[in-house]
């Protein structure tokens, strides 16, 4: 089961036939399922993290187990989807056979994280924003991510396109990426409020103090085989934000791979497609029936 973040659509994991994490798993013989969280409306503004994890994810996992006639699934979570998957796995370890994290943050007090600095309580009043807008606006989210690398996203990218605009393959890939990058969706207001407060501003997850409803999230409860994939050039989720996962879980079979790529290149980059994902599929196959 592939679980993506709430801020973008999940098809980045199946962007094009030759840039597809999904295709790698299918070719390796796995049944692949991917969560589409849909597009929150004003009616969803009160949806909490508990709704997404303990209701939606739990229903999805149970459905897959029923459909495949298996007692467990393997779980892959990307970015915020990885953090949410870790929360789920801590509550329902009995349903998770293997766990793969892909550029998933866990420690938000890392000094190299520009986004975490912007979201710090000193600078960002998340209550005021959600009280006014209801949900986190997609235009605001997209602009925030783009401004992490303004020259690259607003200038250099288009110079690069101009230089290669006669290259049909490059143009096709460029517009596929642009379509996805600009296909942002709102984040349900109460979910965004809790994630910003508990993770970005209080850093409760890494301290073992975060709760969903009445249940405390204990990452030590995760005991299945764990593969933690990080990107050395990730400007959105810096290495230091995601690398602590391996020391926080209770798994004895745990491995980390740091790949020379950025946050998105870790999934769709040409080098990652050729080198990383075949290795990931092999790791998973060795731990699956």
Please annotate each region the language model reported.
Residues 236-239, 256, 260-275:
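Catalytic histidine-centered segment of alpha/beta-hydrolase-like enzymes
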Residues 76-81, 85:
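Gly/Ala-rich beta-loop-alpha elbow adjacent to hydrolase catalytic centers
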Residues 66, 70, 84-190:
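Alpha/beta-hydrolase-fold enzymes
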Residues 75-77, 102, 229:
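Short beta-strand immediately N-terminal to the catalytic nucleophile in serine-hydrolase-like folds
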Residues 46-67:
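Alpha/beta-hydrolase active-site loop
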Residues 1-41:
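Short, surface-exposed "cap/lid" segments of acyl-processing enzymes
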Residues 222, 228-230, 234:
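Short beta-strand/loop motif that positions the catalytic acidic residue
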Residues 224, 238-248:
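Short alpha-helix in the alpha/beta-hydrolase fold that links the catalytic acid
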């Amino acid at each position: 089961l592939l679980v993506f973040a709430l801020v973008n659509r999940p098809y980045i994991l199946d962007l094009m036939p030759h840039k597809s994490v999904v295709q790698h798993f299918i070719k390796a013989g796995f049944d692949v399922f991917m969560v589409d969280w849909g597009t929150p409306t004003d009616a969803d503004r009160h949806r909490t993290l508990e709704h997404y994890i303990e209701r939606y994810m739990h229903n999805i996992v149970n459905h897959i187990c029923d459909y495949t006639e298996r007692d467990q699934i393997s779980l892959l979570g990307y970015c915020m989807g990885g953090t949410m998957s870790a929360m789920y796995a801590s509550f329902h370890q009995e349903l998770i056979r293997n766990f793969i994290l892909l550029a998933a943050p866990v420690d938000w007090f890392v000094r190299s994280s520009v986004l975490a600095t912007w979201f710090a309580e000193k600078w960002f009043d998340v209550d005021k924003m959600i009280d006014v807008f209801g949900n986190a606006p997609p235009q605001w989210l997209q602009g925030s991510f783009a401004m992490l690398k303004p020259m690259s996203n607003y200038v250099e990218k288009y110079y690069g396109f101009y230089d290669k605009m006669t290259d049909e393959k490059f143009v096709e890939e460029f517009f596929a990426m642009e379509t996805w990058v600009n296909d942002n969706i709102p984040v349900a207001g109460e979910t965004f409020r809790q994630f910003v407060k508990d993770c970005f501003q209080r850093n409760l997850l890494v301290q073992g103090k975060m709760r969903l409803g009445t249940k405390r999230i204990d990452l030590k409860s995760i005991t299945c085989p764990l593969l933690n994939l990080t990107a050395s050039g990730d400007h959105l989720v810096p290495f230091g934000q995601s690398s602590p996962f391996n020391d926080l879980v209770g798994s004895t079979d745990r491995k980390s791979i740091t790949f020379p790529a950025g946050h998105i290149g870790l999934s769709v980059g040409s080098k990652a497609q050729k080198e990383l994902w075949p290795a990931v599929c092999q790791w998973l196959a060795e731990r699956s029936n």
